[in-house]
Amino acid sequence: MGILIEKVNTERFSMDFFRFGTGEKTVVILPGLSVQSVMGAAEAIAAAYQSLAERYKIYVFDRRSNLPEAYSVQDMARDTAEAFQTLGLRDVCLFGASQGGMIALVLAIEHPELVGRMVLGSSSAHVREEQYRVIEEWIRLAKAKDREGLYLSFGREIYPPSVFKQYRETLIAAAGTVTDRDLQRFVILAEGTKGFDIVSELDKIQCPVLAIGVFEDSVLDSDATMEIAEKLDNRPDFRLYLYTGYGHAAFDTAPDYRQRILAFFEQGSGEMRSEP
């Protein structure tokens, strides 16, 4: 599969992204918070989304290259919108995972012309004090330059125990490649979630939405997805699905996750129900 790794340059910043796929329509993926840049996982992501690549051109965006000292989720969204506009992307099928879902929400609210359909994965319309505790611990580990501790805490919180056990040694090995710059970027991006709250603006979203959550989300809590549903479930174009047993990173661990995304982008109809 051909993967093109590129950079979009605006007057204010540059942003790395990669793209793959041969379809006519466009899917954009906004990944969640990660210890290292998503660009290093381009091949793995392209392989995971191969079923969508046969029908779509898929863009995966990193955050901007040079981060300011303070960088809120709203700032991330506005920069991502500018990157979209520079590349001529509009009316896209948008998938945002975790923090990427927060960015997607702001995009859909502030730039409805850019988003045609939206899937939110393990995300939230707010980050309150109790939700910030896990992120705050990651920030502490990153500031202490405890690379292994950070990667292990990250894996322990986002994966179910069986998956964490399976990947523990891989996470330890990955920690050895983390640079000081990676840690600095991580802290800025993680701190940017503090105080995020757009619950009162959710009714401004104009596009169809599928919210996918997890009952055992130990990062943002399963209630976060349900709260989005409470604001949008009176709309005929809103769908909700909740997993059991796959952890916060169900977008990586649930075997049928990408098929659900594809079905929503392709049809946008039919009842979506939670697993028993």
Predicted features along the sequence, with ranges:
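Short beta-strand/loop motif that positions the catalytic acidic residue
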Residues: I205, A211-G213
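Conserved alpha/beta-hydrolase catalytic His-Asp/Glu region
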Residues: E129-Q131, G149-F196, E201
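Acidic catalytic loop of the alpha/beta-hydrolase fold
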Residues: E216-L220
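Flexible "cap/lid" loop of the alpha/beta hydrolase fold
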Residues: L105, I109, G116-K145
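Short alpha-helix in the alpha/beta-hydrolase fold that links the catalytic acid
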Residues: A42, C207, D221-E230
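Conserved HGGG/HGGXW glycine-rich cap/lid loop of the alpha/beta-hydrolase fold
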Residues: N9-L67
